[in-house]
Amino acid sequence: MNRLLTAASGLALLMGGIGAVQAALSLPVAQPKAANLARMRAESLNGGLASYRAAACMYETGASSCLISKSEQGFLFGFLGGPPGWQQQSPPRPTLETRILVSQDGERILAVPYNGPIP
């Protein structure tokens, strides 16, 4: 009985994980790399992790929720940020907005059209 329960639990976990894997596989290969590069640039521009955290969407695989556009120019990400803990406040109180354009291959920052106070 325990073996059956263990096998059923493992299968359920595996099936749940398949959805996440399929979602990640549908992303262009360069998108997660581009998202990580954009997030790290924002962290660097805004004083490092000791004083800045990007929005949670930038920590998702590929940051699809923060992706403004994907074109021949590259990946344009737009997201909020602020001091550590800003998203846990009620309501959340971001202090900065950042837009970063990353090359199509996810290797280079092409532009930082905006990084500053929330307009």
Where are these regions (language model features)?
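A short, surface-exposed interaction/processing loop segment used at functional sites
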Residues: 93-119
